[in-house]
Amino acid sequence: MGMRFILGRSGTNKSEVILKEIKQKISTNPIGPSIFYIVPDQMTFQQEVALFSDSETNGSIRAQIVSFSRLAWRVLQETGGGTKQFISSVGIQMMLRKIIEEKQGDWNAFQKALKKQGFLGQLETMLTELKRYEITPDDLRMQQSHLTDFVHQSPSEQGLTRKLSDLIYIYETFIYALQGTYVDSEDQLQLLIQQIKQSSILNNADIYIDGFHSFTPQEQSVLTELMKTSNSITVALTLDDPWKEDASELDLFYQPSQTYHVLKQLAWEAGVPVEDPIILDTLEGNFQNRPYFAHMEKYFDSRPAPAYEGEVPIEIFEAVHPRAEVEGIAQQVLELIRDNRYRYRDIALLIRQPEVYHDLIETIFNDYELPVFIDEKRPMLHHPLIELIRSILEVVQGNWRNDAIFRVLKTGLIPSADDEFPLTMDSIDQLENYVIEFGIRSRHQWIGENKWKYQRFRGFDSSAQTDRERELQESMNRYRDQVISAIATVDEQLRAATTVKDLCIAMYQWLEELKIPDQLEVTRKYYDDQGLPEKGREQEQVWDAVIQLFDEMVEIAGEEKMDLSVFQVALDAGIETLQFSHVPPSMDHIIVGTIDRSRMSNIRCAFLLGVNEGIWPMKPTSDGMIDEAERLLLEQNGLKLADTSERQLLDDWFYMYLAFTVAKDRLKISYLLSDEEGKAKMPSQLIHRVEELFPATKNHILLQDPEDESNTRRFVSTELKSRSALTAQLAKFKKGYPIDPIWWEVYQWYVEHHPQGGTTHRVLQGLHYENKPESLQKDTVEQLYPKRIQASVSRLETYYRCSYQHFAKYSLNLEERRTYKLDAPDIGQLFHEALKKITEWIHAEGNDFSALTKSQSSHYANRAVTELSPVLQHQILHSSNRYAYIQKKLEEVIARATFVLGEQARLSHFSPVGLELGFGDGNNQIPSLSMLLENGYELVLRGRIDRVDKAELENNLYLRIIDYKSSSKGLDLTEVYYGIALQMLAYLDVVLTHSEKWLGQQADPAGVLYFHVHNPMISAKGSMTEADIEEELFKQYKMQGLLLSNEEIVKMMDSSLETGSSQIVPAALKKNGGFYSYSKIADQSTFETLQNHIHQLLKSAGIDITNGSVDVNPYQHKQQKACTYCPFHSVCQFDPVLEENNYRKFADIKENDLLQLFEREGENNG
């Protein structure tokens, strides 16, 4: 019969004509010559359904629906050409890697690119393109020779010449490596071309070709051979005018028109007659009795075009972001199914950005209980088995890095080997917390002989291990043993392996030891039981794919020497190519596809998603090995490669046309106002085109979230989604906004059909929830707090910062995950302990602090840090070179502070009487400060004071408190007033209260001071002598705080002070006596008033805590907020937007006014 064409524009039912003809042939002669219906891969399933689903042709041994690759497999199976080993993408890339590594000499163009990630992938794509377009190394060599003949080569021509030189070498070597043994996907078609003549099933067969718009040269060669052996070839093309031989490149049908004329030419050259084409009428296809769609199809690419007046079943939607878009479309689909009697298979969603829409559609449509099939292969990359393989290689390669180890464990594929301490997800989390806190970061630390120790750093004088720590130590070591048992063997084998075969065997044996096939089978059964057969099938596919990958690597490069790092890269490249093959889970489902890949028919309603500028049509990328200019240069010299980006963009317009004309009954188009990151997006020009053709579509419908949607009835859908929408609507009502009456009917339905105590009841009850914690019941308080509460002053400061912060930290004992790092509190403890020891050593050695030299200060600092660093935070200062440097800098800070303290001591008549002075515990010199509370509880304060100094004046004893701080700090009386700075004055109160028993004499307050331990930097405007520098540095250590307003006492703190400002304390004396106003001073009665105020705050906090008071009441003072560094925000959920959540804002009160407040408070309490 020869060749014939079935031609017609979109919607003319070309496929139906072919199917009808095939059915007729099967019916007439069921066992006649073969019929092959060749379609693209993604079209085979739906055409099989279309051909064999009716009762007349529910099966056939004569007709087969195949793709080109499936036809090749079928023919090679018959003729014996299928004996060669198939090589996949990973095998090709391994072969290319080997070719590159074995090349002698330099490269002309690829030298820098060879080591870049993705180069092998680009190279593979280039070779595939060359094969697909039947370009041989000789063809490239001719192009290179032609370019070399140019006397004056442009830079582009020079670059292309060098690329061709490298490419010829690689291509020739690659073909030689494949020859006789391997075959890739492109070679399969080449073998098919060679074997068609020997195939009996193709002899005298009827061939039908559908769903293609163009063919590669290789596919054209297949068709040429089919023409010579088959009885007939029928090709369906989307084309309007077959007689137009010189169609413009801007013509909508340029691509299929070129295809039509190329196939005619091939038939003529093969001596095959070509029948007159069958041209189908647009008005007799899908658009019969649908003039609006006929108008769309006819004028889609015509300008000017008449407008279609009147209402049309075409709607344009806009959405604020992709989630709102998909949510709105799911509601539209549900409405079509529920109210318009559509079947799921009547509906299609067409997209351009799978990475944006696939997960959203799958999740949201599942919520709406809408069966959906996404016509796209999914990568296996995120399957637990793949994660296990990739992570174990990172473990070995990264010397047992923690993140890699725990990725291995969290796959759930490492079995427990200890019944008493099983390796569950909870225990894995505990183990992870341990290794992060204790700095376990290497293979040596994991597999070393020493047992892990569990003992937290709680200060330099707290060294005993608790019972709980001993229990945790036992469990951590038992978990560790199981990890070592699971990983150590494969680690050793992978390190010892030298060839690809050894590496693959080590991996395979490890997976078998873990019984991965059995574990995957259990997972498959679980998914089958859950009604998720697709997920079940994935378990089989992923194991088969991994084994095939290992087999291929061994087959291609088994004896090749390969480092583990190179093997890891090669295996990763192979893994990235692995994909799940899915078939539709049912005959009735919504189809989701991309417009350039999917082939759809019999679609009643089509949704086009994300119709935005730059996406519809899509700007093509041009990042290949041969760029755009070089492709044009080759084409001008007669070598045709794949289309340029300009041609791709023009062809994309043809795919737009197909998408906009695919539906029979309804077309719904949506575009985004912003992307998932909130960036503004513009609608595609196609939106304006539709508005021009159909003025009735200009009023766009906004797809919004439930709480903003005016048409709320659309949200009455499934039980799950309706409950979510109902909650949003009732929340609006609660805020005073009107809602649609239908929601009260929905609410009543849930009340009647869902039991109390169930999920729905709890969700609706949540509408009445206020973020206000309830006070603790009496029995709870008694369980949390003993009758005699021992508390530090900082704990009570926390209470005044925020009651809930105190509750979370001290009552519930919540804490952040501890990490192996040196925090500010750790540095502060080091400073305190170092300065204490240095002072003790100086006194013990009979030296005078005031006579200390810089050299001595440095010596003492080095001695202190050397002694303390092994105890500090699990020896963190010994863990790395970085921390060794930090240790050196900390020594310098301590040395400088020690020297300055000596200089201050030389000018002071105050001397230390207590260092790191503890109070409140039985072994301490000073008893606790105890307060009986009115509710029967006793508040017992305990703590540790950095330093207490004493001096005597006129037979009176004066005490001052000095606190060492690693950051600059002063005494803010506002903070004292509100209770968030109690510590210094409380400590002063403690030592004054117990001074007679402690020191044998009742003492008076001299002041409270903060000493900033640091190594300051100074800025100089001009040259400075060493003495000037020392003087400026000394000023930087001026202490801040509050002093007794007694000139003699202040002079005893700075004997050099006669008039002016002191360089040691925050006071300044006038010439004629008295203090300057900026001095930080208070008289004796004020100190007593402050002492009384502190007492009241401490008692008040104790009463509130023991009464069970818990409030979310963080303070705010200027720019400071209790929430800023609070780790418990995820627990309290404080939100100032909520009516019930407000900051306690501290008034900004002047210091004099504060002192008056303190005095009035003292009078009232007195």
Curated annotation (Swiss-Prot):
Keyword presence, Amino-acid biosynthesis: no
Molecular-function GO term, any one: ATP binding
Cofactor note: Binds 1 [4Fe-4S] cluster.
Lineage: Bacteria, Bacillati, Bacillota, Bacilli, Bacillales
Residues annotated as domain UvrD-like helicase C-terminal: 283-588
UvrD-like helicase ATP-binding domain sequence ranges: 1-290
Disulfide linkage: none
Ligand binding ([4Fe-4S] cluster): 802, 1123, 1126, 1132
One example of a Gene Ontology biological process annotation: double-strand break repair via homologous recombination
Family under the similarity heading: Belongs to the helicase family. AddB/RexB type 1 subfamily.
Function noted in UniProt: The heterodimer acts as both an ATP-dependent DNA helicase and an ATP-dependent, dual-direction single-stranded exonuclease. Recognizes the chi site generating a DNA molecule suitable for the initiation of homologous recombination. The AddB subunit has 5' -> 3' nuclease activity but not helicase activity.
Class of enzymatic activity (EC top level): hydrolase
Entry-linked InterPro entries: ADDB_N (IPR049035), DNA_helicase_suAddB (IPR014140), DNA_helicase_UvrD-like_C (IPR014017), P-loop_NTPase (IPR027417), PDDEXK-like_dom_sf (IPR011604), PDDEXK_AddAB-type (IPR038726)
Necessary cofactors: Mg(2+); [4Fe-4S] cluster
Protein name: ATP-dependent helicase/deoxyribonuclease subunit B
Organism for this UniProt entry: Oceanobacillus iheyensis (strain DSM 14371 / CIP 107618 / JCM 11309 / KCTC 3954 / HTE831)
Comment field (misc): Despite having conserved helicase domains, this subunit does not have helicase activity.
NCBIfam families registered for this protein in UniProt: addB_Gpos
Entry EC no(s): 3.1.-.-
Residues that bind ATP: 8-15
Quaternary data: Heterodimer of AddA and AddB.
Keyword annotations: 4Fe-4S, ATP-binding, DNA damage, DNA repair, DNA-binding, Exonuclease, Helicase, Hydrolase, Iron, Iron-sulfur, Metal-binding, Nuclease, Nucleotide-binding
